[in-house]
Every structure is written in structure tokens, then in C-alpha cells.
Regions:
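Alpha-helical transmembrane signal-anchor/signal-peptide segments
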Residues: 37-62
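Alpha-helical transmembrane segments forming the membrane-embedded cores
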Residues: 6, 279, 283, 287, ...
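Soluble non-transmembrane domains of integral membrane proteins
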Residues: 78-247
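N-terminal Lys/Arg-rich, disordered targeting/topogenic segments
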Residues: 1-12, 369
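Hydrophobic alpha-helical transmembrane signal-anchor segments
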Residues: 12-40
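OB-fold and OB-like beta-barrel modules that bind single-stranded nucleic acids
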Residues: 73-80, 310
Length: 369
């Protein structure tokens, strides 16, 4: 027997749509925040890069000229050290600018969901470098993490690391992109097992401390070791006495450019400039999706009135996806134009023109529906 279900009441449909309405405002609010943050951050970085580039002077790596103190300098040469760095736990010794032992622990993690009236706590396991104490959890007894680790991360830097007569601080060494994995095949796993009290195995070029790498348990560890070996590097930085540091540009960003090998100062700046748009455009794409999603969710409220209002029916029925896409993109153009208005001249005008064109297209689509 087929039974006709009663039509959903207008009030019920309105109630069901309020959640989408709230979600739409959240999406648009988040999109607006990200647009202003992204455009301001991207412009600030580009401006800082331009300011830094205009001040750069090329200097030799030795001797250090005190007349250039606090100046932005470009230099290239061999980054060297006469000392060795040792990891006593793993019995590793290398001649390097930096030696980094990274230890990841498999542990319980807590996630708080505040979207509901009452906070809801989720627990899951994952790999992290920092050990999270279970005492910070709402339910510490059911999700116990180790109280301590038998071996922890260790970052070491050569104190005599230098580029010619310039002393290289850890910030510069960390910026060197060419870090290599240290071969762990000669590590005494039996000795490490005795020290840590955990079964040790070599998996790839990582040391696994635990019973089964394929089925990790809470408290298991993974150890990776990398080193920055002596090499030729190129730097744009601020000279501070006989050392180098990031330059704080008037626009607001700190600029420190380091590349492996002999790279010209123009190439250093160009490489940094090319990386910036990729990040900016990625965030822009996310913001466009948020705007379209937000508009689409807000349009659902019109579906409630679609049977009551002829105009809403025309807008929401056949071309809802197309309308929300055009409206969302136009809204993104408008918000981005407002965000860029204090920073640029031409781009806000162009974006505003696109926004107006989108609105005009929407009116034409409306009359055609």
C-alpha cells in the first residue's frame, strides 16, 4: 500500500533552512577575513621584498667591513665548520653545520568541537613531535599518554659555523634548504633498545621504537636524523657586526634569503617573489569557494519562499548553481577590491568592474529564467 506523506509545513522548511543560513554567514565571514588577511599579507611581503632589494649591497665574505654594519648585504661563499657534532644517544658523529634528531611519538590527541551548545570531545591517535600530557585531557584515564620519552628531539648547531669571516647563527643555518638525511644503517639498534627499553628496528632510513611498525601503539617512537653539511651558499641579510640576521623591512616583514650554491642577488629575490604569488593565489581560490558556498547556502532560504513568491521561484529553481557561482565570484571581486583599495590603484578598479559585470549578468539571467 502506498501512503502519501503530508507535505512539509512552511514553518518546518524555514526551520530546516536556518542551519544553512547560519552556515552561509559563517562561510562569508570567514572568506572576508581571509581575503583581507591574505591581500594585506601578500602586499606587505612584496613591499618588504622590494624595500630589501633596493638596499642590497654586494660584499665579500672576508674581511668584515664595519662600515656596512646594519646594512642589507649580499654575499656568497663556502659555509664551513671545523668542529664535529655528535648524537650520543645514537652514537653518530658528523662534520656539519647542524645536526637534527627528530623524534615523533604516537600518542592520544584531543579535539574539542565547540560548534554545538555543549562542547564535545573527540580522541584519536597520531604522530607528533611534542608529547601531550594526558592530564590536560578532559578524560585522562581513558586516554593515557606516556609520562616521558626515553629519547627526545635534539637540534645542534656548530658554534664556529662561518661564511668567510661572518659567523652564521642558527637562524641562517635553518634557512639553508639543502639538508640531507643521515645514514642510520650503522646505528647499534641493540644498544638503543637497551637504553630505551623498546624494541628497535630500521625502517627505510628511520629508526622505529616499538613492537610493530605496521601497527603502531601509543608510546611508539620514530626517529629521523638530518644534517646541514658544509656547502656553498648565497645570502641576502642584514649585517650585524660580524654576523648576519633577518632584515626588518619598514613594510613590516622580516626578510632573510638563503639559497644553496652560487645564486645571484637578483635570482634570490626573484625566487622569493615567485613563491609569494603561489600562496596568495591558493588562498584566493579557497576564498572564492567559500564565497560561492556561502551564497549557495544563503540562497536556500529563498527555497522556503519559492512556492509563495514568484520572483524567488525564478531565481532558485532552474539556475541556482549558476546564480550562486556568479554571485559568489562577484562578491569575492567586491570584497577583494575593498581589501586592496588602500594598497593599490588599478587592481581594485578592475575587480570592481568584474563585480559590476557579474551583477549585470545576474539581472540578465534572472529575466531569462
Amino acid at each position: 500500500m502506498v501512503q502519501d506523506l503530508p507535505a512539509q509545513s512552511w514553518g518546518s522548511r524555514l526551520k530546516d533552512t536556518l542551519a544553512c543560513l547560519a552556515g552561509g554567514f559563517v562561510c562569508l565571514g570567514l572568506a572576508s577575513y581571509l581575503i583581507f588577511w591574505n591581500e594585506k599579507t601578500g602586499y606587505r611581503y612584496d613591499s618588504s621584498l622590494e624595500q630589501t632589494e633596493s638596499l642590497v649591497i654586494a660584499v665579500p665574505d672576508k674581511p668584515v667591513n664595519n662600515d656596512n654594519n646594519q646594512s642589507v648585504v649580499y654575499l656568497t661563499g663556502e659555509a664551513l665548520t671545523n668542529r664535529s657534532l655528535s648524537d650520543l644517544q645514537l652514537n653518530i658523529t658528523v662534520s656539519a653545520l647542524a645536526l637534527k634528531r627528530q623524534v615523533l611519538v604516537y600518542e592520544w590527541l584531543e579535539e574539542i568541537d565547540n560548534d554545538k551548545a555543549k562542547p564535545h570531545y573527540h580522541y584519536y591517535t597520531g604522530w607528533r613531535e611534542k608529547l601531550i600530557p594526558s592530564s590536560s585531557f578532559l578524560d585522562p584515564n581513558s586516554h593515557p599518554n606516556p609520562a616521558s620519552l626515553p629519547i627526545e628531539s635534539l637540534y645542534q648547531y656548530a658554534e664556529d659555523a662561518a661564511l668567510g669571516d661572518f659567523v652564521l647563527p642558527s637562524t641562517v643555518i635553518d634557512a639553508i634548504p639543502d639538508a640531507a638525511k643521515v645514514d642510520l644503517s650503522k646505528v647499534d639498534l641493540q644498544s638503543l633498545q637497551t637504553k630505551t627499553g623498546k624494541q628497535a628496528a630500521l625502517v627505510g632510513n628511520e629508526i622505529y621504537l616499538g613492537a610493530n611498525p605496521k601497527a603502531p601503539q601509543v608510546g611508539d617512537l620514530r626517529i629521523r636524523v638530518t644534517a646541514v653539511f658544509p656547502q656553498k651558499i648565497s645570502i641576502i641579510a642584514q649585517q650585524n657586526g660580524n654576523t648576519l640576521q633577518a632584515y626588518q623591512a619598514p613594510a613590516g616583514d622580516s626578510i632573510l634569503l638563503v639559497a644553496s650554491g652560487e645564486v645571484s642577488q637578483h635570482s634570490l629575490v626573484d625566487d622569493a617573489r615567485e613563491r609569494s604569488p603561489a600562496v596568495v593565489w591558493f588562498v584566493r581560490f579557497i576564498c572564492v569557494l567559500l564565497c560561492i558556498t556561502g551564497v549557495s547556502l544563503l540562497m536556500r532560504i529563498m527555497m522556503v519562499f519559492a512556492d509563495k513568491i514568484k520572483l524567488a521561484h525564478k531565481v532558485t529553481r532552474p539556475g541556482a548553481s549558476l546564480v550562486s557561482s556568479i554571485a559568489g565570484l562577484s562578491l569575492w571581486c567586491l570584497i577583494t577590491a575593498i581589501a586592496l583599495a588602500p594598497l593599490q590603484t588599478m587592481m581594485p578598479i578592475i575587480l570592481l568592474a568584474f563585480a559590476i559585470a557579474g551583477v549585470y549578468l545576474l539581472t540578465r539571467l534572472h529575466f531569462k529564467v
